[in-house]
Amino acid sequence: MVDTSGVKIHPAVDNGIKPAQPGFAGGTLHCKCSTNPVRVAVRAQTAHNHVCGCTKCWKPEGAIFSQVAVVGRDALEVLEGAEKLEIVNAEAPIQRHRCRDCGVHMYGRIENRDHPFYGLDFVHTELSDEDGWSAPEFAAFVSSIIESGVDPSRMEAIRARLRELGLEPYDALSPPLMDAIATHIAKRSGALAA
């Protein structure tokens, strides 16, 4: 059996996963600035919440994974601090909008209408003071944490800890999300009826 003591994933899951609250309808995200923070309203429950090991997602200090979920873009509104937001990489499929002062990614948006996830915005629910958001369901792009400097010898224990938390580790997205991407592509190519 692999020793997982001391393995930290992300502060929002390290001490167990909080369940979603039935009927939860969203809340407000805020950056880490002590004065004039960026505030973003999310007026719906999130979906497909997961921890992500990719090197593009924002992670809190000391975390080896981010925690990210999606919500319909029509449910997201920047309330305050829009002038402080900048796009991290305009060429990336997910245009991550971060606070230029503290560096926190407030939301990610896909502008390409042909992208399988167009219409969904990516958010970090730990930036909210409200409880009740959808619970993380899986771990994505797990091997990518090596690219950010995690020693490969730690991977067995990290995957074991993810499983202890109920977060099945994948080196892509979860099977239902990968199926959604493949279905979108097959319909666009004509391999499946649209």
From Swiss-Prot:
Function: Catalyzes the condensation of formaldehyde and glutathione to S-hydroxymethylglutathione.
Enzyme class: lyase
Pathway entry: One-carbon metabolism; formaldehyde degradation; formate from formaldehyde (glutathione route): step 1/3
Keyword Metal-binding applies: yes
Single GO biological process annotation from the record: formaldehyde catabolic process
Subunit structure: Homodimer.
Cofactor: Zn(2+)
Entry superkingdom: Bacteria
Note accompanying the cofactor annotation: Binds 2 Zn(2+) ions per subunit.
Protein name: Glutathione-dependent formaldehyde-activating enzyme
Binding site for Zn(2+) 1: C31, C33, C99, C102
